[in-house]
Structures are given as C-alpha cells and as structure tokens.
Amino acid sequence: MNKKTIAMLGAGSWGTAVAIHLAKIGHKTLLWSHNPQHVALMAEQHSNPAYLPGIPFPENLIPSDNLIECVQSANYVIIAVPSHAFAEIINKIPKPTQGLAWLTKGVDPASHELLSQLVASRFGVDFPIAVISGPSFAKEVARFLPTALTLASNNTNYQKKMHQLFHHDNIRVYLSDDLIGVQLCGAVKNILAIACGISDGLGYGANAKAALITRGLAEMTRLGLSMGARQDTFLGLAGVGDLVLTCTDDQSRNRRFGLLLGREVPIPEAEHQIGQVVEGKHNAAQICAIANKNRVEMPICEQINALLHGIVHAQEAVNNLMSRPAKEE
C-alpha cells in the first residue's frame, strides 16, 4: 500500500509502541506529547526512555508537541491518551479528514459515556471512527512480536483503510462492527485485572484467579448485552483475549497495581510505584455507574470500586464476594 503520514496523539507506552510499529512498516509517524520536555528528550535520545526504554525509534518517527500541526499534516489520526484526557484532545483538534481511530481503553469520567459517544457529539454521528483493541502489551508490539488485534468501526471503507494501515507480518487485525462491545471490554478488563492482582497479592492462588476471570467475563458480557453489544465480541480478542492477558501477566500495570493493594500498600503509594496511569482505577466508578443505570449486577467491579474509595479493605471485599447468596451459573 502507499505509505502515509500518521499522527499518534499520546506518547505513553502504548501510543509509542504502535507509533514504532507504523514507522517500521514505512509510514511517516508523528508522535505527539503535551510535554515539550518529554518531546525534547525523545528527539535527543531517539527513543522514549520515560515510557518505553531501550527501544530505538525508526528515523521516520518524529516527536512533536504541536497538536494542531500534527493533525493537519497527517493522513490518519490515532489517539492514544488516557481516557480522562480523551475529551480534552478531541475538543482541541480540528476535524480529521479521513476519520478518527483510538487505542484508548476506558470511558469518559465526567459523562460516563463511551468514547465513541464523545466523538459523535464532537464530529457527528456519521463521522468514521475505529477502535483498536485486543491482547497486546506495548513492549511486545514495539519489538515486532506476533500480536492479534480487533478493529471495530462504524464505516466499512474507513475500516478497510485502517486495516491496511496496521496489518503486517507481526500484527494480524480482525474486523468488527461492535463498537459498544469492544469499548466495554477494554474498560472493564482493567478493573478485573486489579481484582486478580489483589487476589494474588493476598496469596489466594490459581483457583481464586480463575474464578475472578470467569465471573468477571460474565459481568462484562451482561453489561455489554444490556447496551446492545454482541455476545461473540466478549469471547474474542477484545474480550476474553485481553482479559486473560491483563489479569495474568505482570506486564499489566492494572494487575501490578492490584498486587500492591493486596499486599496492603496504600493506594497513592501503589500508583506512585506503577508510575503510569492505572486505567482500571480511573474507570471503576464510571463502569459501576453505567451498570447501575442499566440495572446490571457487577459484584466484582462493585467491590473493587468500594475498595478504591476506601469503603472496604481487600480481605473484606473478598469476603463480600464469597458470602453472596447462592445462584445458578
């Protein structure tokens, strides 16, 4: 395919990893950060030592702190900022010519809306969008290790273009039109990863972790179906694939955060030790609010939210889950 210019808005570990992938396969890639000092450091060291150390940038990956210039000079725009910054970014940028894609996993903390709803309000309901999700750690993508992703979109033409943009020998992209399901999977799995980390931090073993993953998948699916998502999405890469990866591997910052909480490390200190945004912490209250609105029971997410707000401690949260009334699976 013809090589394009890509604007990657967000220079954390995941945005940087995907920017490296796109640059390696030949696309000129502009990597935007809001921090001029961060941009200067990346330009000087030809890498991102703050978020993805030890992985050099290709020559066609260019750091920038000029948001508008990046968007206006790009053929395609991809957002990779944390969910709490997503609304601010889309309100600052001009309307992209082709459409808008994002790697962000979460919901808007202010409105409790899915990110696709924010984009529809800003650029129109028919504006082409794409959500890229699935089981993928930044370091492995940046190192060109095999990865499979889900790309959900509301526009088949735009989806085809984004598929061509990403697909390569090391990345296989599967297509979906279930924007609701893919977005919910990305948000809820982070909360469940915190739960699994807490369980392991408490020393509860493999049985408890398997139960949390399985019952967590049931919670995620119930919420999605209540909002119009498709069940098969939750059994795919964006659902069970990303859930298992995030809950079981210590590359997951949400899981590591949970491990610290299970070992009785205070929340502020745990966040400090992780050193990057813990999306599950930010999204727990929002997911619980969405569940309440849709009258969906999500006991694991509810207990994690209560723990994060100081209402229960880790052992008490486990006791509350284990003492729930008996029910059919």
From Swiss-Prot:
Q: Which GO terms describe its molecular function?
A: glycerol-3-phosphate dehydrogenase [NAD(P)+] activity; NAD binding
Q: What is its EC number?
A: 1.1.1.94
- Record: residues binding sn-glycerol 3-phosphate: K105, G134, S136, K189, D242, S252, R253, N254
List the Pfam families hit by this protein, alphabetically.
NAD_Gly3P_dh_C, NAD_Gly3P_dh_N
The reactions it catalyses are:
sn-glycerol 3-phosphate + NAD(+) = dihydroxyacetone phosphate + NADH + H(+); sn-glycerol 3-phosphate + NADP(+) = dihydroxyacetone phosphate + NADPH + H(+)
Q: Which UniProt keywords apply?
A: Cytoplasm, Lipid biosynthesis, Lipid metabolism, NAD, NADP, Nucleotide-binding, Oxidoreductase, Phospholipid biosynthesis, Phospholipid metabolism
Function (record text)? Catalyzes the reduction of the glycolytic intermediate dihydroxyacetone phosphate (DHAP) to sn-glycerol 3-phosphate (G3P), the key precursor for phospholipid synthesis.
Instruction: Extract the HAMAP family matched here.
Output: NAD_Glyc3P_dehydrog
Q: Which family does it belong to?
A: Belongs to the NAD-dependent glycerol-3-phosphate dehydrogenase family.
Q: What is this protein called?
A: Glycerol-3-phosphate dehydrogenase [NAD(P)+]
Q: Which species does this protein come from?
A: Legionella pneumophila (strain Lens)
> Gene name on record?
gpsA
